[in-house]
Amino acid sequence: MDNLKINRQMIRNPLHNSGAVAVSFVILFTSMLNRRHLRIKILHVLYAFYQDEERDVVKTKKALDHSIEKMQELYLLLLLMIGSMQSFAIDRIEAGRKKQLPSPEDLHPNTKFVTNRPLRVLANSKNLSEAAADGNIGWGNHQEMLRKIFRGLLDHEEYTTYMASEERGFRHDRECLIRMFRKHMINEELFQDNLEELSIYWNDDLDLAASMAIKTIKTIGEADEDVELLPLWRDDDDDRQFFEGLFKETLAQATENESYVTEAAANWDLERIALMDRILMKMALAEARTFSSIPLKVTLNEYIELSKYYSTPKSHGFINGILDELFGKLKKDGVIKKTGRGLIE
């Protein structure tokens, strides 16, 4: 990936300022990856590809596959981070008891956090430790960062409220742990700064990976002694085929789809059309032409949404107009063909 340099701020959002990003959570899935995220992954590497003089397809595909692997690594690291908080809490309690002049609080500590049941499941998870070992994944030299995150947690409202509450119960433990993770751990500026240094992919992956970590915690039942990890892909191959096919066909159809865009945008100054917009439209056309079971409206809406986040403020209107015109024309000409219930007119 050394020669496929990605402008991280442009890819994340060319209009957003840098700095810690508050993570939001709106998506829950039965696997880690979803099609919108796959589209974004492909968009990232194609943006780098078209900026690179070599335009090496093989190298670009390797970078794409690597970014998917890094997504899974981040998911596991987040779960490991949550589990590590118990170890720091235990160390703190033991250190307090060993003081020469321990306070009553040191001698009789509040153990509500260290006995939080979902936290204990994560901290002692065989499935998680084996998956991490198999991928050689761990926080390694970043223990001090985790320790500082734990220290910050001690003063966070979610933690102090939880510890002061007399409420008990598995559901209470689980909900409070999720809030501590969501509101403090991953939104800690130190964590986000380190994340950017560890991998160029992870700031864009954090939202989804954190959603997957929360989904995993929510699956922990009261009687569970271990956690079931989410698979990277669903059991069926539909999403994997979509991923492979969209990347391949966007490049294979690039020249032809570029000509369609050029024709439809005849009244526009083509040199002023942003590279990001051109890539989005070529991806959308490749998707519409290749995947007969995906409704055109779905494809259109997906790329309009991506343009709102990754391109200029006016791009979504431009892309909407061009794609709407081209989809209608190419469907009429038989270039775009749809099959399945509700897709054949």
Q: Locations of the language-model features?
A:
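Class I Rossmann-like S-adenosyl-L-methionine
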Residues: 25-345
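Generic detector of intrinsically disordered, low-complexity, polar/charged segments
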Residues: 16-19, 318
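Acidic, Ala/Val/Gly-enriched low-complexity intrinsically disordered segments
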Residues: 2, 20-26
